[in-house]
Amino acid sequence: AVVVVALDQLTKHWAVARLSPEGSSGIHLVGSLWFRLAFNSGMSFSLGTGMGPVVALIAVAIIGVLVWLSRSIHSRPQLVLVGIVIGGATGNLCDRLFRAGDGFLGGHVVDFVYLRWWPTFNLADSAIVVGGIALAVILTFWPDEPTGEPPESPTGEPEASGATTGGVSGVGAATDRP
């Protein structure tokens, strides 16, 4: 999550410093891909425009739920993808908190990646969408992969792998005999 937030904020800082104000043509990269500065007070695809504080509070709630849920995930790929989604949501939340706007949590999110056939977006938006879709695919089609850490017993102690009998574990373990 920290890497996503850092990259998101660095790219947004670059966009604000280097790109012309909203309404200019921007920088053409290739095909329909442009860098063009835009400020979004709503959510992805400009939904909820003018509802910055509500969007920010929803983001805080989603981040909190994802952090809470991540405690029960035992698959490294799932943890990484949840971290990517949390990083994206946190990156956009940082904009709402620290960029001038319309009062409490009313800052605008910096968007700058423009495709002529798609709404303008940023790295955080990409992390949320791509991470969320990848997480949904993994949760749907692949079983949990353990992180390598032993599961905890109800007492909080790591459980031993395999059955134990008389203090010896594994196949051919000693048994109590009369």
Annotate each PLM feature.
Residues A1-P178:
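Alpha-helical transmembrane bundles and membrane-interface segments of multipass inner-membrane proteins
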